[in-house]
Amino acid sequence: MTSPDTVAISPVDDIVADMRAGRIVILVDEEDRENEGDLVLAADHVTAEAINFMARYGRGLICLTLTRERCEHLQLPPMTARNGDKKGTAFTASIEAAEGVTTGISAADRARTVQAAVALGAKPNDLVQPGHIFPLQAVDGGVLMRAGHTEAGCDLAAMAGCTPAAVICEIMKDDGTMARLPDLQVFAAQHGLKIGTIADLIEHRSRVESLIEKVGTRTIQTAYGEFTAHAYRDKPAHGIHLSLVKGEWAPHDAVAVRVHEPLSVLDALETNRAMHSWSLDASLAHICAQGKGVAVLLNCGESAAQLLAQFAGTARAAHGPERERMDLRTYGVGAQILRDCGVHRMNLMGSPRRSPGLTGYGLEIVGYITQ
C-alpha cells in the first residue's frame, strides 16, 4: 500500500492518456528504488508554463527527443563526432528558433524553439545553432531497440497520437542530488503527476510488436558439441543475428546465457581475444558443459575500418569499466532473441552491468558468471 502522500506506478494506457491530454508525466526505467526519473511532455503540447515547471522543479537539462528521420530532415548534426557517453545518449547540436525569440533562454523562447522544431512543415532554416534546446536522437525501433528516456519520449508521444517528439528533463532534489523513486513518488503526489516505467512500455509494445524475424533453423556441429542454430533478421537494421541453443529447460530454470557482441570474424580465430570477457570458444564450451544454454551472436555490421582496428588491436573492448550495459544498438534485438529461444531466467556470462528494461521482455538476470 502507498501512503496518501505518494503515487503508485501507473499503467501505460494511463500515461499515454495524460500525454494525449497535454499533461506532464514522470518516467523511470523500472520499479526500482534506485531509479532516477525524467519529466516528459509530448512536444506538441509544449508551453512556456511547462518549460518553466521543468526548469523550476525538475532542475535538469531540458532536452527535445526526436526521431532519426526528423533529425535528418532538420539537418541536425551530432554534437560530437565520437559519442563517449556511457549510456549512448545521442545529442545533436543545440538549437534555437530562427525567429520569434530574444535571448533564447526564457521559458517562452525555449517553448518557441520546440514548436519550431516539431511543426508539421518545419524546415532546416527554421532553426539556428547553437541554442538553448538540446535535441536527442532516438534510435529506430524505440524502446524495443534501446531502453532509454529518449526513445520512450518519442514512443509515448506517438502512441498518444502526437508528433513522435517529447520535451524531457531530469528531476533533481533540493540539494542537487538525483531524485530516486521514493522521492519521485512524493514529488508526483505534490504536483499531481503520474509515474510510468520504461519496462512497462517495453512489455506493452513487445506484446504486439517484434524487432526480429526468424529466417532459418538448422543443427550445427561445433568443436564442443551439437547446437541448434537459429538465424534472425533484424527489422530496423536489416542485419542477420544468430543464436546457438543447447538442451532443453523448464520456464523457471536459470540457464547459462552469453550475448556476444559485436560479432567479428576474428572471434572465430583467436581464443584469447581481449575484446570480450568470454571468448566465443569459452562460451560454447561452458554451455556444453552445463548441458543447456544459449549463445546469442549479434552482428553489428562490422565495417572494413572496424575489422582493421580489431586486427590491429586498437578497437575498444566489449567489456571493462566504460561498458556498463549491453550494446545499445542491439539491446532489444538480443532480448527478443533470448525470449524467442525460451529464456526467462538466466545466468549471464560476463561482468555485471546495468541492463534496464529487461523485465519488460520477461527476462530476469539471476546472476553473472565471470571467468
Predicted regions and their residues:
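Catalytic domains of riboflavin
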Residues: 1-371
